[in-house]
Amino acid sequence: MKSAFERVSEITDELFAVVHFAGVYMLDSLVEMDSAAFERIFKINLGGVYLINKTFLPLLKSGSRIVITTSELAPLDPLPFTGVYAVSKAALDKYAYSLAMELQLMGIKVSVLRAGAVATDMLGVSTDALDRFCKNTTLYACNAERFKQIVDSVEARSVSPSRIAEKTLRILSKRKPRFAYSINRNPLLLLLNVLPKRLQLWIIKQVLKQK
């Protein structure tokens, strides 16, 4: 990271924006997953953003922007088996809001883009992770195949990376950007989230229980 900062500093002494798109996906049971994998997703999805912002802050001036792509899941209640990914993105969303509170004092604006499924290689990773989970789980074998059908239906409604890029450019062009923006959010997930938590739990249990 230090060498990256030094190379950028050789070219310019000021950045208008730092934009975060990178992240990793994980699908697994919270009680079956490897502890190293649990730590890794937070180190990348949250720790990576923290480290980049901290490193490149000297190049950000009043009027500069930071845009962080989180997930449509970030403000929602987590679903089973995608919990660790959703929690890492929720933590990233909270980090971004706290960062916005701090950096506004320096004239730097922070926004998040909460995106639904995007047609990138991550969808393939998601499918592979789901297949691996369905094959390896010993506690939820009766539920896994049904969950696979649900995830497949959610991910079928994806947008292209160019749509994300266009949305990001629009955010950067705004004189007074909002903190949160959304794109391609799944209406069924939004509907589930407005229900009482007790009802959410019951619905998920009915959907995933063994027939």
Where are these regions (language model features)?
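Hydrophobic positions on the long internal alpha-helix
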Residues: A4, V19, I52-F56, L60, ...
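SDR active-site lid
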Residues: L105-R178
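Alpha-helical segment proximal to the catalytic Tyr-Lys
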Residues: P58, M101-E102
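Active-site loop-to-helix junction immediately N-terminal to the catalytic Tyr of the SDR YXXXK motif
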Residues: M33, P78-A86, S98
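Active-site helix of classical SDR
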Residues: N53, S88-A91
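Conserved NAD(P)H cofactor-binding loop of Rossmann-fold oxidoreductase domains
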Residues: F21-M26
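Substrate-binding pocket helix/loop in short-chain dehydrogenase/reductase
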Residues: S29-L30, A37-E39
